[in-house]
Amino acid sequence: MKLGQGITTVVGPNGCGKTNIVDAIRWVLGEQKYRVLRSGKMEDVIFNGAEGTKPLGVCEVSMTVHNNAGKLPIEYNDIEIARRIYRSGDSEYYLNKTQCRLKDIMDLFMDTGMGVDAYSVIELKMIEQILSEMADDRRKMFEE
């Protein structure tokens, strides 16, 4: 899936996977709160199988970010971020196919507006929360 510059919206009927896309982006960027990902535990992101299809032992998401403008503090034009989790609970993170720490990914996106805690990926429930907040709280959020 390719997302262009500017604002991208994902629309579709209920149950078609819109929230799964948002969850995958949050997860690869380092989301640690499994409840944010609509799960009872982190391993729930791994495919549990279906009729005629066996469960998998691993989940992997990768995302490529273009750094042509040099806004990220790394000397690459294209940066691939990947995350894997195994049924054992072990997790791995990668930057450009080199294993790294979660902290390395968090540091890369710090102060860019693109990290896991940023408002660059917004779900409908977050919009509803923003609209119901007091004016001062909304102003602080936009200043972030």
Can you say where each PLM-predicted feature lies in the sequence?
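Gly/Lys-enriched N-terminal cap/neck module of very large, oligomeric protein machines
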Residues: M1-E144
